[in-house]
Structure formats: structure tokens, C-alpha cells
């Protein structure tokens, strides 16, 4: 997409948004100075209730159309406390244009919004709809976003848990497979889910990005003849590795500063990359550095229940690997047999049963909470 076309699209559609086939103008979404609410807020508050997902959409649009050039977003908090960031609306539109251009979305295409609006992923679905003139289909965030739909959207962004759940219900699976442009982010895609996606007739993509990059700056194809383990960055994104082999991102159209991530990565000869894990998810046990994500990937095929790997301090080894298992009862003998198949330094030294694994609001493993759960358990024993 050339710059003149980009400018044209932005100016043409930024002042209107289509929701469930009904067009709303910026003036209707903007807060009135007289009563502190927009016409859209009043309508959605009355129809759906002040605490509804539709009302949160009206609140976001009121913020989008206010006089400020920035708005506040929150990180997911997967590795610690969520952070507040102020981001430029102009750069959010730049991010939207990257995705619209890459996927070749067109005015009038439907876009399902099934992500929480307090985080960047949900906000960017709305911004893409504004910029490209998409028909936004709001679905309150849940584990089965397809369950009440009669026709599939043209475009949707989902987390792995939503995709997995939808695949388990035949009617939802049928609709899911008809989505023409499906992007999946917010968590790892395991081998079983990746295999199931191979049957999809349309392109399915895994995204790489974060709040600081205003959603994704790279995609990798999950199905078809072009499927790959490697992410391809957008054209205006420059990537490199730090001395610690963590990914450094230079993407001036969406992020003003050089971004140093905690993601340990490697490149291939084509400039594509893949993520090996996070620096803050490295466990140093007995002088050997173990990557949590790699242990979890190996255990996926060995354990048939939800689990997480975490660690606790250990006076002998520095850190001790701990396995958290979500189950009513656990078969220690069976689990120990599975653990023996791991390399020696990868093997958890302790197994803890819990009722529910800690997740963030966006469905990511809450690593900080997992460590706290393990530490509290150890302290009590």
C-alpha cells in the first residue's frame, strides 16, 4: 500500500465506525461537554448496561475521538505487575495499516472483536476497523466466541485458548474454519493445536508483538504450504540481537524508541526469527540455565492435564524446578515416569497440585503468580 492510499484511507474512515452493520460518526462517539457522555455511550449504556462489553467499546471510542493525541494502555502482566503506557493514536493507526495492508483487508469486511478492550490487542481490532472501514462485530470476551454466531467474520484476532475451545464444538469449528483471516496471539501455540490448524482452508497466522509495539510487528504462517516456525517481520521493522541474545526491535512507525525485549531469539539466513523463550523465564539450577518454555514444550506430549513450570529458591542448586499441575487428583508414579524422559537438569524436583493454573486476563501464564504459589507451598511444608 502506497503512502497516498494510506493517507486517503485514514482520513476517509477515521471519522466513522460501523458496528453490527450500523454506522456511527465521530460526533456521536465523542463525549458531550454538557453531560459528560457521548450519544453512543448513552445508547449502549441503556441497551446493554453500563458494565457491558458494548459499553466498554463506547468508552474506548469516546477516548479515541477526544482531543488528546495519546491514550493509556496496560501491559498484560504475564511476568509481573501490569504497567501503564501512554501511546500515540497516530502510531496505533500506523500499526493498523501494517496489518490491513499485509492481510489485504477491504472496506466492509467484518471483524470480530472478542478480546478485552483494556489491552492493546482488543483496542487494535477497533482501530483496524476504524482505519479500514471494517464492520465491527463485538463479542464479549469468553472461551467460546463463535458460539452465538450464524456467519463467520472475515477477520478475527483470537488467543490460543479461544481457538482450542472452538475446535471442540462442531458448529463452532465449522464457523472458525471459514474465517478468511485468522490471527492468533497472546500465548504459545502447542504442537496439537498447530496440527489441527493444518486443516484450515484459509490463512492462519501466529503474531509476534507486545503492548509497546502496539500489537504485532511480525507474523508466521501456521497452515498451508507456506507454514513456518519462523516469524517474518513487517517491511519497516529492523531486528537485531543483544549480547544476551534477546531481540531488539527498531520500528519507528509504531514505537519511537529502540525496544529491548526479554525474548531470547535466533535468526535464519532470510532475516526471519523465532523465539526460544524469555530471559526472565530462565531457571538457573546447579549452574545450568533451563528455559521454562522448552521444558513445557517437551512435557506437552507427556502429560494429559494442564500444567506450568516454575521455580523456587534452593540453597544447594540456587533454583529448584517445580511442576504445577491443575487436577483434582494426580498420579505421582505416572508423572514421575514422564519426568524421567526429560534431560536430567530439566526434571522438576517437586510436583504441586493446584485447583487452577494462574493466568492473566488475556490468557497468558502468570509467571509471577506461579512462582508465588510455589513459594507459599514450600514455606508451609
Where in this protein do the model-derived segments appear?
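Gly/Ser/Thr-rich phosphate-binding loop
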Residues: 9, 169-224
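Conserved pre-ATP/AMP-binding loop-to-beta segment of ANL
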Residues: 55-74, 107-108
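Conserved AMP-binding A3 loop
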Residues: 69-97, 104
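AMP-binding/adenylate-forming
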Residues: 88-94, 110-165
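Conserved AMP-binding/adenylate-forming
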Residues: 195-204, 212-272, 279-282
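AMP-binding/adenylate-forming catalytic core of the ANL superfamily
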Residues: 264-346
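Conserved C-terminal "lid"/linker of ANL adenylate-forming enzymes
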Residues: 283, 310, 322-326, 337-381
